[in-house]
């Protein structure tokens, strides 16, 4: 099994609703370790660059507005198959389709405010981690 890094973002709705500790518990109970973490307020430019892959999608403007509406917590998670493991504990993108026992299944109600972001591939995890963290911040 491969030890990997993945990026997690606890979105503004998670911070505003004070459930970051609950989400961190799900992460740690899965066997993943939080090795870097910081709270920040994304600028419009940062959100546009981070979600650039979605720039031609109809929800892009709403996504950028939401991601800049309040503080987020960005994290680096480390563990065996971290990318797929975190995607599994996040649950389906649409909380209505997410299983109970997943972050979205237990804490989210709406697809546009679904509490968390996680890298979808090892390659994207590397890019996303580098977007938010300098190499010297990584353990």
UniProtKB/Swiss-Prot annotation:
* Active-site residues (renumbered): 117 (pros-phosphohistidine intermediate)
- State the needed cofactors, names only: Mg(2+)
The record ties this protein, via InterPro entries, to: NDK-like_dom, NDK-like_dom_sf, Nucleoside_diP_kinase, Nucleoside_diP_kinase_AS
PROSITE patterns according to UniProt:
NDPK (PS00469), NDPK_LIKE (PS51374)
The catalytic activity of this protein is classed by the Enzyme Commission as 2.7.4.6
Matching SMART domains = NDK
Q: Catalytic activity annotated for this protein? A: a 2'-deoxyribonucleoside 5'-diphosphate + ATP = a 2'-deoxyribonucleoside 5'-triphosphate + ADP; a ribonucleoside 5'-diphosphate + ATP = a ribonucleoside 5'-triphosphate + ADP
Q: Name one GO molecular function term.
A: nucleoside diphosphate kinase activity
Keyword set, alphabetical order: ATP-binding, Cytoplasm, Kinase, Magnesium, Metal-binding, Nucleotide metabolism, Nucleotide-binding, Phosphoprotein, Transferase
Looking at its record, which EC class is this enzyme? transferase
Tell me where it mainly resides: cytoplasm
Concerning Pfam families, the annotation shows: NDK (PF00334)
Which family does the entry's similarity section mention? Answer: Belongs to the NDK family.
Record PANTHER family: NUCLEOSIDE DIPHOSPHATE KINASE, NUCLEOSIDE DIPHOSPHATE KINASE DDB_G0292928-RELATED
HAMAP family membership: NDP_kinase
Protein's recorded name:
Nucleoside diphosphate kinase
């Amino acid at each position: 099994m491969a030890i990997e890094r993945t990026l997690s973002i606890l979105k503004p709705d998670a911070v505003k609703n004070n459930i970051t500790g609950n989400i961190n518990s799900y992460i740690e109970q899965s066997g993943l370790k939080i090795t870097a973490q910081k709270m920040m307020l994304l600028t419009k430019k940062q959100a546009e660059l981070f979600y650039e892959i979605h720039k031609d999608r109809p929800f892009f403007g709403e996504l950028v507005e939401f991601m800049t509406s309040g503080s987020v917590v960005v994290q680096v998670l480390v563990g065996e198959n971290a990318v797929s493991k975190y995607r599994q504990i996040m649950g389906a993108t649409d909380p209505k389709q997410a299983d109970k026992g997943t972050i979205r299944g237990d804490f989210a109600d709406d697809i546009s405010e679904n509490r968390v972001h996680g890298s979808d591939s090892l390659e994207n995890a590397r890019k996303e981690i580098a977007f938010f963290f300098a190499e010297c911040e990584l353990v």
